[in-house]
């Protein structure tokens, strides 16, 4: 886990340089793509523009969190499990990317407010 954290910091740099978590999403390449032509407007999958290494690390973090959820509870794995149970049509990769987005928002909020992660606070505060 420490090696993963070091690799992630090496790829993302200081998260304080971003104004919003959406900017981090775009930097990593998990922001939603859009197609517009005339009056047609459709949403695509993720853009994949950005740091592909950071995107892979974050994806692997979600899978690692899933394996240790029994001993180390996290609101992100709770979210992943809830989405997995409620959606028969959505694939696990889409759910994992949604969880990556939630992880980015959580990391950004914790760094912005200079706080440590607390599972009890995270489950009370649904925005994290």
Describe the residue ranges of each PLM region.
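Low-complexity, acidic/Ser/Thr- and charged residue-rich accessory regions of DNA metabolism proteins
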Residues: 39-40, 77-128
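Phosphate-backbone recognition surface of nucleic-acid-processing proteins
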Residues: 2-3, 7-88, 92
